Structures are given as C-alpha cells and as structure tokens.
Amino acid sequence: MSITNRRFAALAVGLGLVTLPALSACDSSDAAGSGDPKTITLVSHDSFVVSKSVLKDFEKQSGYKVRVLKDGDAGQAVNKAILTKDNPQGDVFFGVDNTLLSRALDNGLFQPYVAKGADLVLPEYRTDQDKHRVTPIDSGDICVNYDKAYFSEHKLKPPQSFDDLVKPAYKDLLVTENASTSSPGLGFLLGSAAHYGDKGWEGYWKKLKANGVKVVDGWEQAYNEEFSGSAGGKKAKGDRPLVVSYASSPPAEVIYADPKPTTAPTGVATGTCFRQVEYAGLLSNAKNAKGGKALLDFMLTKEFQDDMPLNMFVYPVREAAQVPPEFTRYGPPAKDPETLAPEKIAAERDQWVKSWTSLVLK
C-alpha cells in the first residue's frame, strides 16, 4: 500500500518493529533472485515492514530464509517487476494495489496459486477469482484528514464530503499530492472519479482549483510540511488544516505521540475516502516457486495479519484478524468508501492523470 507513509514506517522502528534487511535493487548479483532452494526473495515497495519475531517464526517453521528486495515506491516497484518478469528479481511480489493491478495482470507478472487461507479473506477483498493470480493481503482508505484544533479555534465544522471541499468556507485550506507522482494523490483523484463519474470529475476539480487547492509532489511534503496538524500540531510547519492522507493517520498520531493524547488531534472526512487493497503474488518464472507459495500462505496466517496494522498502518483482510484498539477508536475503515473496479482503473487511469495534470497543474 503502500501505505506509502515512510514517516509511519520509520517511527515503527522505534517501537521495536523493523524494516526487513533490504537488498539494493541495483545490485547485479541480485538481479534474478537467489536460486537457492532454501531462500525466498520477496520483492516489495519501500514501505514493507514486519516484526522481526514474526519473520523468525516463519523461517523456523518453514526452514526457509527470507530476504527482501525493496524497489522504490509501489509504482516503481511494479514497473521494475514487469520489465524483469522473464528473469525475475525474486519469487514473490508484494505491494501491487488495485490502482495498478490490471497493469500487472495484463503483463503476465504472476502465475496462478491459491494460497492457504484464501477462503478466510473477507469477500469484499477477493479478486481474480477465476485465475487466482494474486492474493489480497491488506487494505486501507485514502481520505482527507483535518486538523481538529484549527476547526475548533475557527468555530468551523470540518468538511465531511467531496462536495464540502469546494465550499467557500474551506477556500485555501486543502493540500493534496500530485496524482501523477503520489499514491494518495492518485487515490484521491480516483475517488473523485468514482464519486462524480466520467463526465463529472473534471468539473469538480475545476471547482477545487478555484477554491485554492494546493498540490505538492508527495505525501511526506503534504503531511509533514504543509499540513498544520502533523505530529499533533507540535512540529507542523504548514498552514493547511486539510490534507489528503489515510484513515489510519489519526491512530498513528496517537500511537507515536509522547505523551499520548486522550483523543486524536486529527480526524477523517469519511465522505472523501477511496479504498485501496494491496496484493501479493507468485512471480512468473520464480526460481523458488515452492518457497514462494509457502510465504504467500504465511502472509494470510493470523500471526502475519495481526502484525500488519502497527507495522504498515493498514488493515488486515483475513476474517477475525486483530486490529489495535487505537485503530478502532481513532481510524476505523470508512463504511462506504469510493471504489473502482481494477478493469475500470486500467482503462481510464492514464487518461485521467493526463487530463488532471493539464487541468490542475497548468
């Protein structure tokens, strides 16, 4: 998913959670997996994080050694995997989400495999059921977040919907990420397209532009530099009280605060959310397909699924997986998020981004 919050991933290290030792994507010795039948190579985006104890449990139980090749953000990693599919860098790829899934499938990136535990995945996350080329692993919502202190001080009700964001009361308050360079920025664009349809989303963005929306390159700049509520407002540099981020951002604000507040300093505009789902799959031409299948099985176990929320700030997809109380209290998934079929995204994404760029950035 990335959820591509490197800030959250970095802070996780301080909690005793570790990013797995990563190989350089440019190291020629790692260009085509290890070929070692007892080593599994997992290719992923930069934000993949797992508890060391969970990984060790898998290695002890399975007899395999896991190494991780981190290959940039989700889009970069998927593109690299497609380019190297005939001689893949690893055995399993994790981190292709629903915004990029059709591109990966159309390019033959994965081979079929039904992971053990697939029947325990919540129905709304299941996809590619006829060919089983990918396994759902986690989900998350991209949503507008708001700085509670700002709206309290200004006696202004926080926006809750896409329509609210174009009202005069919220002029010059929103910062979002570039849809062509950022996963949350793209998600927000897709959410607006899902909400207003093919003929309505451009008109919406014209109104949003007229209402002073600010566009920056990526999430870190938007959240940590432009948003007034970052780190509970204590370290915020920006003056924008609205930012495109994640439904899991308010829980992170509580979990990483010292001392911990009794309430989250930020909230979520639940009517602006777009649902992301991340998948993993067995790479075509994987050197260690048997080991890759074992790793995919493990990623659907309760142990791995329970471990994800505090590592990557995403929600598990397995039934009865545990979610930290901070998530339930401060950042539950949206009840009715915007969604788009992967096929629709594949057909329209590039043109939407091109039109958005021309409309908003020029």
Which role does the model predict for each range below?
Residues 325-362:
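Extracellular/periplasmic bilobal clamshell ligand-binding domains
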Residues 88-93, 111-146, 163, 173-179:
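A structural signal for short loop-to-beta-strand junctions that line the ligand-binding cleft
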Residues 184, 191-271:
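Ligand-binding pocket segment of bilobal, Venus flytrap-like solute-binding proteins
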